[in-house]
Structures are given as structure tokens and as C-alpha cells.
């Protein structure tokens, strides 16, 4: 007979696409609105790799306001059409809205005294643009700890972010 599984003492969540709406939806929306072939932006991000604008922004090396110029460079490198990195980043940040069912689940876990953590790839804002920061402030009471790639200088899937 199978042994009963013990209740967890802690649960780790990603934010984008789990607790918050997915940034991938915002990327797809940007492509659709601008008549860009589907998956173009993901190809640019992938081809640029760890030295590309997106990876650098997620490590906090450049802010959301500094993203547009290096992203345009990444687009040129892979032969993609010119893309408005500022508009793209705005859509991504606007997509950072909570998923009500996940907020409810987090509340249940907290009420059950189960530790909760968030591990997220995010971006460093600058004064006057606190959309993602505001989302984090609103979520803070639901987590014992939030680990942010832009603060740690390392992003998922790099194993160092897990230690």
C-alpha cells in the first residue's frame, strides 16, 4: 500500500505566467498588433542569448528604459524587422496583473502556515515607471521571500539563482 505523502512545508512559485499573467501573451499581442510574424520576438531573444537585451534586462544590467536601443541591435543581428522595444516592454509590464485563482491559492497556503516563496525573472525599473515594482509590493504579503533576477544579477535557468 502506498504511503501517504507528507504535507509540504514550503512552495516556490514563479511569478510571470503563474501568479501573474504571462509576459509571453504580451509578446504575442505585440506581434499581432504590429503585423509581425508569430514568434519573431522569441527568436530574437533566443538568438541574442545571454548577452542580448532581454537577458541583460532580466539580470538588472539595463533598466526597462535602457532596453530599446540594445533590443533594436539584437533585432538587426538576426535580420528581424525593426521593433519598438519601449512599446514591447510597456506591454510586458502592463501584463503583470495577478491571476485571482493564484492569489486565492496563495492565501490558502499562508492560512495553512505553509511557507511561500517567489522566484522570478524580472526587470529593473527607473524612477517614474514602477509598474512591476508595484505588482511586487502588492504580492509581498503573500510570500515569505521574493527572489528577483534583476536584484540578484542572475536569472533562471542559471543554477546560481537557486542557491
Language-model features and meaning:
Residues 1-2, 101, 145-146:
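Generic signature of intrinsically disordered, low-complexity, basic-rich segments
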